[in-house]
């Protein structure tokens, strides 16, 4: 039986469409949709168990995978099977998770999975832009307790015109690339990179994307209505004990307020809050704690949050005593590590990052191999967040999704400032050594200084700041916080990271936890962020004002040369013999790539000693040397012969040519040794290929004046000098008429 399907179509306004369909695939999932644009198809399924887990959080898993079959390709590697997710897939998972998670009830703890799979790929469609739409549409068809439909859209700007979900080719021309996640009435998530745009341009891009998202949300509602909405499931939630809430609040609020107002350090504050919590718990009997001890802890956290927020809203004072627009104390240092190619330390309050830079060849580029995108990154950044940076001991596993996301944000913040002509592959690694908020922005600042310390000629330095928000919807009060602490991130309503140069924004990431954030607040936050960024930027440039003129003495120097493709084989040699011996002899690394546009070979020479690099350059010039007809070259005699001398071009050692004895002087030369000796250096003129010998012809005498009275010898007439040599035996006069006819015929022996 053919299943009944339901479908809605979204018009993007430029001839492109996105369709959402359900009813055909994965019907045992609690909700499933296929989202399609062009030939690109995403399957999204959602499932949530009916059993609640005893956890203080929602065990939500968002999984996004791109199947290689979708692009008609095989997975790389030995096993030929999709394995762990790529960084690109992890980033898409985070984009979707950050919008979905806040919309589930806080006391909902059933295991929930959202799985999104790329089933068919279209080179003109970037699939991750539709992942949020697919996830929300599938949830709308389920019975999950989910607050409202959302969607996500990518926005670009080409020639001043905004575009929704641009192609990869359009993005290459765009000065904005942002992913926006929103409900119908609120922007919830923003992440992207820009080419030093203004705060006003950024707000306009967000507004444009939000209007497109509203259209996508309407399509989800139409699909759910046509399919038939399910009744929201009931789940076992813990009712609030109002008497207990009041009791805990009355005991803790004033004490927490006083500690928060004291402006103490993170450790002192944490210890003080822990003592207050223990005092509250000690006021209850063992029987009471056994009955609702977890509730006491929950209600204490509510009282603590309320006290800290009220302090900031009422008095404009923050946990560490700063004003709302004040940035923590900063100190910086460069060239800290003696053996790396570039290093820096950036410390802001109790957050510290140590950044290192490593320079390499194109062979060291980060390879991207995804069904939706293949390529390489010549600049990339890795972010590490070890447990000791927060004073904790926990299992050390692989790179976390958070580390991937924070590293990607810092990379996007900096990469636009790496000049295209930079010959190196550049890797930045940020080690977070202390963390009390905004470690990703510390990474941006440390990365900037380390790059300049390494001699990477950045266009402009970049700084970053994390902004926060505390608001009261009832009273309308709000406070925008500059350079937030970890506790302010946890207790606040917004985490908004902004990076940029003195001239504009290069990257941003925003997560909003409250509904109805006005654009007025967003504009104010951006203006306050700019002031903070410029203050931090001044601290960076006080430490290192501009990039070092050259790389470190122990860092490799990179020289790039281009040669015609026809010489690549000669440089490599049979079985790679020439290039391998050259690398061994000079202590360099030589990488050869081909430019398909110019049809040239690009030779990268990497070495720590200039002498070795110079030897490689000389060898390349020797191999690719082509003398020009009519030009004069300096040569050196390397061998004397009876009929001339073998000379070597001084500009291309190893390139030899015969200087014939007749080209030494206008007068007759009887002995070459009378004119030249081994090691002599002289000038010769190049005449191209000799038509008789088909070998290169050079002349010394062509650069000399002819002696007075010199006469050219007339060429000899070979026939006149030697006479007729066939003696009437030529082919045309063989005397056939004079043949004897008296010869006897040959006898037949048979």
From Swiss-Prot:
Segments forming domain S1 motif: 630-701
EC number: 2.7.7.8
GO BP terms: mRNA catabolic process; RNA processing
Family matches, as CDD domains: KH-I_PNPase, RNase_PH_PNPase_2
Basic and acidic residues composition-biased segments: 702-750
UniProt-annotated location(s): Cytoplasm
Span list, region Disordered: 697-750
Coiled-coil zones: none
Cofactor(s) the protein requires to work: Mg(2+)
Domain of life, per lineage: Bacteria
Reactions this protein catalyses: RNA(n+1) + phosphate = RNA(n) + a ribonucleoside 5'-diphosphate
Record GO terms (molecular function): 3'-5'-RNA exonuclease activity; magnesium ion binding; polyribonucleotide nucleotidyltransferase activity; RNA binding
Keywords, comma-separated and alphabetical: Cytoplasm, Magnesium, Metal-binding, Nucleotidyltransferase, RNA-binding, Transferase
Broad EC category: transferase
Protein name: Polyribonucleotide nucleotidyltransferase
UniProt organism field: Christiangramia forsetii (strain DSM 17595 / CGMCC 1.15422 / KT0803)
């Amino acid at each position: 039986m053919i299943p009944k399907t339901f479908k809605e179509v979204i018009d993007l306004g430029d001839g492109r469409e996105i369709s959402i369909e359900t009813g055909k695939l994965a019907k045992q999932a609690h909700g499933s949709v296929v989202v399609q644009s062009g030939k690109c198809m995403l399957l999204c399924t959602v499932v949530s168990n009916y059993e609640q887990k005893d956890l203080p959080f929602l065990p939500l898993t968002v999984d996004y995978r791109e199947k290689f079959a979708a692009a008609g390709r095989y997975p790389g590697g030995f096993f030929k099977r999709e394995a762990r997710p790529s960084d690109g897939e992890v980033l898409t998972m985070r984009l979707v998770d950050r919008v979905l998670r806040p919309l589930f009830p806080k006391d909902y703890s059933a295991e929930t999975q959202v799985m999104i799979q790329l089933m068919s790929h279209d080179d003109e469609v970037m699939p991750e832009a539709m992942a949020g739409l697919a996830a929300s549409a599938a949830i709308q068809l389920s019975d999950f307790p989910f607050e409202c439909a959302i969607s996500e859209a990518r926005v670009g700007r080409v020639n001043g015109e905004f575009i929704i979900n641009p192609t990869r080719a359009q993005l290459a021309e765009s000065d904005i690339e942002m992913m926006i996640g929103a409900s119908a009435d609120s922007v919830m998530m923003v992440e992207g990179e820009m080419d030093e745009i203004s705060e006003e341009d950024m707000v306009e891009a967000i507004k444009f994307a939000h209007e497109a998202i509203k259209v996508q949300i309407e399509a989800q509602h139409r699909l759910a209505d046509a399919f038939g909405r399910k009744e929201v499931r009931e789940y076992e939630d813990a009712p609030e004990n109002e008497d207990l809430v009041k009791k805990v609040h009355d005991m803790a609020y004033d004490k927490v307020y006083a500690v928060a107002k004291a402006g103490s350090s993170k450790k002192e504050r944490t210890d003080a809050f822990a003592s207050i919590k223990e005092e509250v718990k000690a006021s209850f009997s063992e029987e009471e704690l056994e009955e609702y001890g977890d509730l006491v802890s929950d209600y204490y956290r509510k009282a603590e949050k309320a006290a800290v927020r009220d302090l900031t809203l009422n008095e404009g004072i923050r946990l560490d005593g700063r004003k709302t627009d004040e940035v923590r104390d900063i100190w910086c240092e460069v060239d800290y590590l003696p053996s790396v190619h570039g290093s820096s330390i950036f410390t802001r309050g109790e957050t510290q990052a140590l950044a290192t830079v490593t320079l390499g060849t194109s062979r060291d580029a980060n390879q991207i191999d995804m069904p939706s995108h293949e390529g390489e990154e010549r600049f990339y950044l890795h972010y590490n967040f070890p447990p000791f940076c927060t004073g904790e001991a926990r299992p050390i596993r692989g790179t976390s999704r958070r580390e991937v996301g924070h590293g990607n944000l810092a990379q996007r913040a900096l990469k636009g400032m790496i000049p295209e002509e930079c010959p190196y592959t550049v890797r930045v690694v940020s080690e977070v050594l202390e963390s009390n908020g905004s470690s990703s922005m510390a990474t941006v600042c440390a990365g900037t200084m380390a790059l300049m310390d390494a001699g990477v000629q950045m266009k402009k330095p970049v700084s970053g700041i994390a902004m926060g928000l505390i608001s009261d919807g009832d009273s309308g009060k709000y406070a925008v916080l500059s350079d937030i602490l970890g506790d302010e991130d946890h207790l606040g309503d917004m985490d908004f990271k902004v990076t940029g140069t003195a001239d504009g924004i290069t990257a941003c990431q925003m997560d909003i936890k409250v509904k109805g954030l006005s654009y007025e607040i967003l504009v104010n936050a951006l203006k306050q962020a700019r002031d903070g960024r410029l203050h931090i930027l001044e601290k960076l440039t006080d430490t290192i004002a501009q990039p070092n003129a050259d790389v470190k003495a122990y860092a490799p120097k990179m020289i790039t040369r281009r040669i015609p493709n026809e010489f690549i084989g000669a440089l490599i040699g049979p079985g790679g013999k020439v290039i391998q011996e050259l690398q061994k002899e000079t202590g360099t690394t030589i990488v050869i790539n081909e430019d398909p546009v110019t049809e040239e070979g690009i030779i990268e020479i990497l070495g720590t000693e200039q002498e070795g690099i110079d030897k490689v350059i000389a060898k390349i010039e020797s191999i690719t040397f082509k003398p020009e007809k009519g030009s004069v070259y300096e040569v050196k005699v390397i061998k004397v012969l009876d009929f001339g001398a073998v000379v070597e071009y001084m500009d291309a050692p190893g390139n030899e040519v015969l200087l014939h004895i007749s080209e030494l002087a206008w007068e007759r030369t009887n002995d070459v040794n009378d004119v030249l000796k081994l090691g002599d250096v002289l000038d010769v003129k190049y005449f191209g290929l000799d038509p008789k010998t088909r070998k290169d012809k050079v002349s010394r005498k062509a650069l000399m004046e002819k002696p007075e009275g010199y006469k050219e010898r007339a060429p000899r007439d070979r026939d006149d000098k030697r006479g007729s040599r066939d003696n009437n035996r030529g082919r045309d006069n063989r005397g056939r008429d004079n043949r004897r006819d008296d010869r006897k015929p040959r006898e037949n022996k048979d």
